[in-house]
Amino acid sequence: MVSAAASAGRLGSALPFLLVLLDLQYQGAECGINAEVEKQLEMGKKLLAAGQLADALSHFHAAIEGDSDNYIAYYRRATVYLAMGKSKAAIRDLSKVVELKQDFTSRLQRGHLLLKQGKFDEAEDDFKNVLKSNPSNNEEKEAQTQLTKSDELQRLYSQALSAYRQEDYEAAIPLLDEILAVCVWDAELRELRAECYIKEGEPSKAISDLKAAAKLKSDNTEAFYKISRIYYQLGDHELSLSEVRECLKLDQDHKQCFSLYKQVKKLNKQIESAEEFIREGRYEDAISKYDSVMKTEPDVPVYATRAKERICHCLSKNQQATEAITVCTQVLQLEPTNVNALKDRAEAYLLEDLYEEAIKDYETAQANSENDQQIREGLERAQRMLKQSQKRDYYKILGVKRNARKQEIIKAYRKLASQWHPDNFQSEEEKKKAEKKFIDIAAAKEVLTDPEMRRKFDAGEDPLDAESQQGGGNPFHRNWNTWQGFNPFGSGGGPFTFKFHFS
């Protein structure tokens, strides 16, 4: 696609040649110009050649103020406008040149610009006038070439319009491509191609054309409205809000833009509020806000999917594993490679001790986001936890969840310690079994009530396992002699043998 900016750049690169052509065409024409106007023209010419367009423009403004009938000043100002991409202003100045001095050069240049704007009839009038007025061979050749080009462009336009009306958008697009390669400043053609792109499911290309149209046509509220609608349908509420505001800057009473603005602003506010709650760790509040998002916009599926993705995250972070797995799965049914949902469901699986499922989710996430350090660390942790679960799982020993509070852990420990105290058993075999069980129960309590030891265990490292400690003796080794006489209900005092009596 040829952008307006690119075309202006190419035209700008041809300006020194046009200036030389002008000076040759009007050699000696500046004789008789008053000194101040001549000075302004010369300064403007030098600045234009140096590419200092804004400064050059101010000098040509001054020259025209000093002599409003100076066609050279208008021509040079038109040249600056052209370099700045202001084709409408350039055409006005070229029309003034034609009015002041019937001239082939200015007519040809104006015809070129009119053709780039898609004004075929007006461009053809200029080219035909050149041909009628005894032009030089080069001028005649150029005018005839442009006239032929204009006829061909009109033929292509007729075909494109016919294809569009027949809803054959696939056929219309290449025809419009060919026309817009020449008519780079035709806003209506860009809007027509944008409509074709929308129908063909290519919203990003439609946005590109509509943005160009918004720049080419002043007060183009319709283009801004359409851009905002497309962004909204894509789920980009922030860009949608930005574009609809541009529409309202041009016309604050624009009904469609104002209606869309209210909707997007409300949705945007809810999403921003929900994200702020997430940053603060207020997950229940964030879930409530995202529920509101789905109620605010029930008709655009992407918002429900994004809301559920964030609810999945909140539930996982809030250690509501069962609910998190349900919501994350709903998201993944729609988007099987959604990396965020895969990570959050993996974490929820870990809370439920479903290590293999967590590993599978992390591996899928990694396949779709290879350089994500969080995924790599999560996968390694899940693999360690699977290996750990095949050895000794302190949570399972006490029969508590991974997110159990300290009070729950102590309560479970006391119950099991009283149940499995070896003094409760008579036979030697039963005592040995109880001793082993009791040691595991006491070890589980030791690890899970110590924040640092629990953190290590949750990361997949057993702080009481010599192998996990990477060499050396196990500083946490325990046997029955260590625990003999230990009171699971006491908080101090000397050791004693705990006896149970049942009536």
Swiss-Prot record:
Any one annotated GO CC term: cytosol
Repeat positions for TPR: 37-70, 71-104, 105-137, 153-186, 187-220, 221-254, 267-300, 305-338, 339-372
Designated name of the protein: DnaJ homolog subfamily C member 3
Listed GO MF terms: misfolded protein binding; protein kinase binding; protein kinase inhibitor activity; protein-folding chaperone binding
Xref: SMART domains: DnaJ, TPR
Coiled-coil ranges from the UniProt annotation: none
One example of a Gene Ontology biological process annotation: negative regulation of endoplasmic reticulum stress-induced eIF2 alpha phosphorylation
Locations listed in the record: Endoplasmic reticulum
Entries under InterPro entries matching the protein: DnaJ_C3_Co-chaperones, DnaJ_domain, J_dom_sf, TPR-like_helical_dom_sf, TPR_rpt
CDD domains, per database record: DnaJ
Intrachain S-S bonds: 247-257, 312-328
Keywords recorded for this protein, A-Z: Chaperone, Disulfide bond, Endoplasmic reticulum, Repeat, Signal, TPR repeat, Unfolded protein response
Gene: DNAJC3
Signal peptide interval: 1-31
Ranges where the record places region Flexible linker: 374-392
Matches recorded under Gene3D superfamilies: DnaJ domain, Tetratricopeptide repeat domain
Function, in words: May be involved in the unfolded protein response (UPR) during ER stress.
Domain J: 393-461
